[in-house]
Amino acid sequence: MADSTRPLLSDFNSSESNLPPPRSLEETIERCIGDFGWAQFLQAALVSFAWFFDAQQTFITVFTDSQPMWHCDNSDRVDSVCNTSSSNLCTLPNQTWSWDLNPHVSIISEWGLQCAGSFLKGFPASSFFLGCLIGGLALSTLADSSLGRKNMLLLSCLIMSLSSMLTAFSTSIWVYAFLRFLNGCGRATIGTCALVLSTELVGKKWRGQVGAMGFFCFTLGFLSLPMLGYINEGNSWRNLYVWTSIPTLIYCCLVRSFVRESPRWLIVKGRKEEAVSILQSIASNAITMSFTNLCFEVENDQSKSNPDVYDALKILVRKSWSFRRLLAAMVVGFGIGMVYYGMPLALTNLNFNLYLGVVFNALSEFPAFLITFFFIDKINRRDALIGFTALSGISSALIAVLGQQLGSLQIVLELVSFFSACTAFNMTLIYTIEMFPTCVRNSAISMVRQALVFGGVFSPVMVAAGRENQFWSYGLFGLIIGLCGLFVFGLPETRGSVLCDTMDEEEYKTLAKRQFIG
């Protein structure tokens, strides 16, 4: 079976006949493109920059949906019933108070939602994450089946940018929530497509570093929002959606014109001439190999003339080993996602300055990125994930044990827990890339990313319960990520492994590894 499924390279020029034939498509591609050159770097950087816009749309509601500050009118009067520090805004007559800034700075003040229930206030944000879940399930397999990585990335960015632009013209919270849902549907596959495409354009030596570039761009996008919010202070919240949508539209044009499709995906789909052309365009200048007679032989796992868009998911579930890997990775992702999305929300439960806490949380993503970038090729994936999930869980549980008396120590533990969750978040995505072959890789990583988002869906409820007792927020955060992290023991180690392209090739590699160990 191994001989019939492994990719082969044939018909070398006579000048290359002294070179041993590569044993896999991975070696063939690395031999073609050579060392990591400028062409590959520019391709990876352009693709990874999609994460920048992804982060902006994920966290933009921090500013657009916030509760504005207000003040009492004529509060110096003896008979005044208004007191900013002790009065409930909803019990005061409208003529006794005013917003500090223009009512159009937030959807809360513009649409008079200050006294609405927590469900209605949070409905747009919930709609966004619901869109992420549905969009991820509905669109993720298209990158493996019919559209490919590049076209799926382009479509996702286009949907996200257009829906963001339309959001600026919302006339009610219901229209606003629907457009946020549509925005989430488009945004759902951006991170996975960008990560998979950027790593498939380079060899395994630089795979981890290139994957970490996307995480760095995501952090930059997150940090760009406070700057935009400061510039827009006192003006309409609609400006933020316009300002973030226009650059995304420009980025779509750049992707359409300059980004190359994954040569791995093209080869698996039988489009070998296009793959050779792309390999030639991104090859290092030092490579002199002739591409004219380059020939790949790859068995297509989806040998159908008209493949179903959900073929990749069917293959993942049909094979017992891939289903076990996917299930374990999703459980790990669920626990990590709950802490990653829940920790910033739970800052309001700590006895610490909220603004400084948010800034520290955002900045803690930088060391998480640096560790991923510089050490991803030096550390075992399983050991690192177990260590970071355990550290995050212990730190989070200690916050609940200490209580609110030690505010400074609590924020230190919170930052340690959030930093560990960020690092585990990054490593989980790279780990998933290495565990699954090209024919199902995008679908697998999309499912794991949906598990991360699904974990975040429960975080707001736990944070609300934790206002009375921190065990229900930080205590459960620590317990869940710690238990979910144990599922890493069911996953294979992938550091330094070759990326496979078909299910049979992955099975052969796993079998050979077991026989070697045995």
Curated annotation (Swiss-Prot):
Reported function: High affinity carnitine transporter involved in the active cellular uptake of carnitine. Also transports organic cations.
Name of the featured protein: Organic cation/carnitine transporter 3
Residue ranges that the UniProt entry lists as topological domain Cytoplasmic: 1-32, 144-157, 198-210, 260-325, 377-383, 432-443, 492-518
GO CC terms, sorted: plant-type vacuole membrane
Binding site for ATP: 198-205
CDD domains: MFS_OCT_plant
Recorded superkingdom: Eukaryota
Glycosylation sites: 83, 94
Record GO terms (molecular function): ATP binding; transmembrane transporter activity
Lineage: Eukaryota, Viridiplantae, Streptophyta, Embryophyta, Tracheophyta
Family classification: Belongs to the major facilitator (TC 2.A.1) superfamily. Organic cation transporter (TC 2.A.1.19) family.
Transmembrane stretches, start-end: 33-53, 123-143, 158-178, 181-197, 211-231, 240-259, 326-346, 356-376, 384-404, 411-431, 444-464, 471-491
Species this protein is from: Arabidopsis thaliana
Pfam short name (any one): Sugar_tr
Extracellular side: 54-122, 179-180, 232-239, 347-355, 405-410, 465-470
UniProt keyword list: ATP-binding, Glycoprotein, Ion transport, Membrane, Nucleotide-binding, Transmembrane, Transmembrane helix, Transport, Vacuole
Span list, region Disordered: 1-23
Induction field: During cold stress treatment.
An annotated GO BP: monoatomic ion transport
Protein topology in the membrane: Multi-pass membrane protein
Compartments (UniProt record): Vacuole membrane
Broad class of where this protein is predominantly found: membrane
Tissue specificity comment: Mostly expressed in siliques, mainly in young seeds. Present in stems (cortical cells and parenchyma cells), at the basis of secondary inflorescences, and at the base of trichomes.
